[in-house]
């Protein structure tokens, strides 16, 4: 669910997920879809593609369990869809951390999604 995703992003990046990534570039946050503006936005694009491959669960609502061991996210679900959902969220949280150095505040909040160019299909 969005709850676990937000928690993972906070743990990996130290940033408030809603404030920092809720409306960022063309792909981070609700809605938005388009050619990624930078590496951070690309993380979100890949994450949305990961969600599209899921069948049998709702990425925004379905809760799953994971643990935080030695600063590593460990997904722990028996249900295959929830496990894949957790892995999608884990991947984006790690990607966002790995790209903190290219995070650009100009793409946060004020970037107009109508100006996003159509992205390649997943």
Curated annotation (Swiss-Prot):
Myotoxic activity is inhibited by suramin and rosmarinic acid. Cytotoxic and myotoxic activities are inhibited by pre-incubation with varespladib. Suramin inhibits this myotoxin by (i) direct blockage of the MDoS and MDiS, preventing the toxin/membrane interaction and disruption and (ii) formation of an oligomeric complex, resulting in a tetrameric configuration for which both MDoS and MDiS becomes physically inaccessible, thus avoiding any possibility of toxin-membrane interaction or disruption. One of its GO terms (molecular function) is calcium ion binding. This is Basic phospholipase A2 homolog myotoxin II. Disulfide bonds join 26-116, 28-44, 43-95, 49-122, 50-88, 57-81, 75-86. It is found in: Secreted. Its main location: secreted. The record marks 15, 19, 113, 118 as: Cationic membrane-docking site (MDoS). Lacks hemorrhagic, anticoagulant and coagulant activities. One of its GO terms (cellular component) is extracellular region. Expressed by the venom gland. Transmembrane segments: none annotated. Belongs to the phospholipase A2 family. Group II subfamily. K49 sub-subfamily. The record marks 112, 115 as: Hydrophobic membrane-disruption site (MDiS). Snake venom phospholipase A2 (PLA2) homolog that lacks enzymatic activity. Shows high myotoxin activities. Also shows neurotoxicity, since it induces muscle paralysis when tested on mouse phrenic-diaphragm preparations. Displays edema-inducing activities. Also displays antimicrobial activity against E.coli and C.albicans, as well as antitumoral activity against some human and mice cell lines. In addition, it is effective as parasiticidal agent against Leishmania sp. and S.mansoni. The record marks 105, 108 as: Important residue of the cationic membrane-docking site (MDoS). SUPFAM superfamilies: Phospholipase A2, PLA2. It comes from Bothrops moojeni. Keywords: Antibiotic, Antimicrobial, Disulfide bond, Fungicide, Myotoxin, Neurotoxin, Postsynaptic neurotoxin, Secreted, Toxin. It comes from the Eukaryota. It holds the Pfam family Phospholip_A2_1.
């Amino acid at each position: 669910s969005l709850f676990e995703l937000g928690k993972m992003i906070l743990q990996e990046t130290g940033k408030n997920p809603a404030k920092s990534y809720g409306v960022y570039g063309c792909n981070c946050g609700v809605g938005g879809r388009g050619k990624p503006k930078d590496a951070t936005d690309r993380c979100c694009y890949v994450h949305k593609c990961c969600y599209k491959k899921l069948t049998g669960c709702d990425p925004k609502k379905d809760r799953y369990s994971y643990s935080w061991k030695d600063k590593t996210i460990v997904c722990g679900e028996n249900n295959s869809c929830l496990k894949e959902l957790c892995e999608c969220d884990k991947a984006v949280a790690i990607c966002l951390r790995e790209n903190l150095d290219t995070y650009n505040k100009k793409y946060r909040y004020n970037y107009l999604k109508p100006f996003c160019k159509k992205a390649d299909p997943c």
